[in-house]
Structure formats: structure tokens, C-alpha cells
Design a protein with these regions (language model features):
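Membrane-interfacial terminal anchoring regions of lipid-handling membrane enzymes
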Residues: 1-261
Length: 261
């Protein structure tokens, strides 16, 4: 929402313009926040809309997905199962995208205190410069997105879903997305040992990204990999009518809803 974001920069500039000399200028802060959860309840419908628009005649949506029995199934799951949500709060920013300290002072890349007012000064005066403020909006938006990535919390459900889909893609490199979604049921199986090894490798990369400060992960991602995988499978698409990922009787990984996966 760049237009909404731009309004914070305009407001900060107006505060500098309207505050009488000698008075403290109120400062506007941006605090990135992410909500992290195992699945998106409306994902099947959102994905269906996207695939219909992108695939057109290459995509045939499923008809009559929600009958009376499906509604009863959903309500039963909704009232008998639970799922976790975590809230991640990032570092505070000023309207230019600089980090701020505990006292609200803006900091440059070297951690030195800087005056945000200087960003709005031209020839010694506070000025209105639309082009300049559009550039500030772009910088601020990029900083917020990078903070979203940094504080985003990876769950086991995210990992198992990512690994499974990537493995199916690599098994069928000649198929595009819509060809992949039409895979016959007998090809929608991943051997558990192969899946387990890939999950361990991906988890190791997640740990490395966390050490670099690029991402975060839930505490349940640590520990025995089989328990982590089980936790992920138990929670991915927990309320959806068709589970996007689960384990079959032979102990291998399958999907009942490739589209949602």
C-alpha cells in the first residue's frame, strides 16, 4: 500500500513545517509486524482464483467443492482442532526506513544518531518535494519488506509443504505448473526416507539463514527430524477439507490437494 505509506512521509514533513520553533516535533514511527500461522483458511479459494486467471483454458477448476457433507466436516474440524499463531514484531523505523533506538532517535548505517528533519530540507528550509518523497516511500517500503523477511517465523508446516512441492517439481522438470497439478495419483507419492533427508538439508539451511539474521523459525523446528516432520504434517492445512500433505499407510508422503499445496 504505497499510497498509504506515502501519507506517513507527508505527515512527518507537515509536522516539521507546522511545529513552532523551539517546540519538540512529534515523530512518526513504523513498526513491522508479521502474523505467522500454519495455514491460510481461505487459501484454496485464493489459489483457485489465481490458477483460473493464469491458466485460463489450461486449468479446470473443481466443481461443487462445498456440499452439505463438506460443510459438516469443516465445522467438526473447526470446533475440535486447534492451531498456533505467533506474532513477530520487528525493529522500529522512522519514515525514511532508518532504525531507531529505544529513545526514538534515528540511526544511520553506522549506528550514529541523525536528524530526520534533514531529509526534508532544501536550501535551508523544509520544502514539499513530491518526487523526493516518492523516492523515500520506495526506500521505506523496501526496508519494511526486508524486515518482514527477517522477522518471519518459519513453522514445520511451512517447511514440509515447501520440501514436498519442490521435490515433485524436480521429479518432473519437463512439466509446467499446470501439468504438475494434473499428475496422476500414483505419481503423487514421495518415499519417506528421501523426504526426510531433504527436510534435514532444508532445515540446516534455515538455521544458517537465521544465523545471518535473514529469517527466524519456531522453536518446534528444532529436535528430532521425524517429530518435526510429524508436527508439520499434523498442522499443514489442518482445517481444509482435503489435506494438502499427509502420510499414507505405507508411511510415505502424499497429497490429497495438489492445488492447495
Amino acid at each position: 500500500k504505497l499510497g498509504l505509506l506515502n501519507s506517513t512521509i507527508e505527515a512527518q514533513r507537515n509536522l516539521f513545517l507546522d511545529t513552532p520553533p523551539g517546540e519538540e516535533v512529534r515523530k512518526i514511527f513504523i513498526v513491522p509486524v508479521t502474523l505467522n500461522y500454519h495455514f491460510v483458511l481461505e487459501a484454496p479459494d485464493l489459489i483457485d482464483e489465481y490458477l483460473s486467471a493464469k491458466g485460463q483454458d489450461r486449468y479446470l477448476p473443481e466443481q461443487d467443492k462445498y456440499g452439505s457433507w463438506q460443510l459438516i466436516q469443516f465445522l467438526f474440524k473447526f470446533f475440535t482442532k486447534g492451531s498456533n499463531i505467533s506474532v513477530s514484531i520487528g525493529n522500529g523505523l522512522d519514515v525514511i526506513g532508518n532504525y531507531v533506538d529505544d529513545h526514538g532517535n534515528s540511526l544511520d548505517a553506522q549506528g550514529r544518531i541523525i536528524d530526520t528533519r534533514d531529509y526534508f530540507v532544501s536550501n535551508g528550509d523544509i520544502t514539499v518535494d513530491k518526487q523526493r518523497e516518492d523516492e523515500y516511500t520506495r526506500i521505506l517500503s523496501q526496508k519494511i519488506v526486508s524486515e518482514y523477511h527477517r522477522i518471519n517465523r518459519i513453522f514445520a508446516s511451512h517447511m514440509v509443504a515447501f520440501v514436498a512441492f519442490e521435490m515433485w517439481q524436480k521429479k518432473h522438470p519437463k512439466l509446467d505448473l499446470f501439468g504438475l497439478l494434473r499428475l496422476p495419483e500414483e505419481d503423487q507419492v514421495i518415499q519417506y526416507e528421501e523426504f526426510r533427508k531433504t527436510c534435514k538439508r532444508v532445515r540446516k539451511q534455515i538455521y544458517a539463514l537465521k544465523e545471518q539474521g535473514k529469517v527466524y523459525h519456531a522453536t518446534h523446528l528444532k529436535g528430532n527430524i521425524d517429530l518435526v516432520i510429524r508436527h508439520g504434517l499434523d498442522n499443514v492445512g489442518i482445517f481444509h477439507l482435503k489435506r494438502p500433505l499427509l502420510m499414507n499407510k505405507e508411511g510415505n508422503i502424499i497429497t490429497k490437494d495438489f492445488n492447495t499445496l
